[in-house]
């Protein structure tokens, strides 16, 4: 599977490639021609192992939920396992993000999650704003 929708952001000193179709991840970051994040080839991405490269939002939870289960308000919730037997790094990194705005040096993207998808009981919406300014992100 290849992901063709790559957003390229650029300043005189910074270059950033964003993959909205692949979890809104930063696939490449270059500063003064030095690779901060080495890009990976989108043709070899395994969708359920996309946490193994680049930088992405850990939404709605970070790290691991042991045995993919948690309790809240005396109810037990079972999440989809994406690192068996655990759930890891949320699920926004697995979803397609939509581009709301783009300039040469910035982008705003959004991910909308439906309740109960991947076992997560609540719907949510999350935004990323990425802006390059000279030597800052």
What are these regions (language model features)?
Residues 1-136:
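Surface-exposed acidic/polar loop and edge beta-strand patches at domain peripheries
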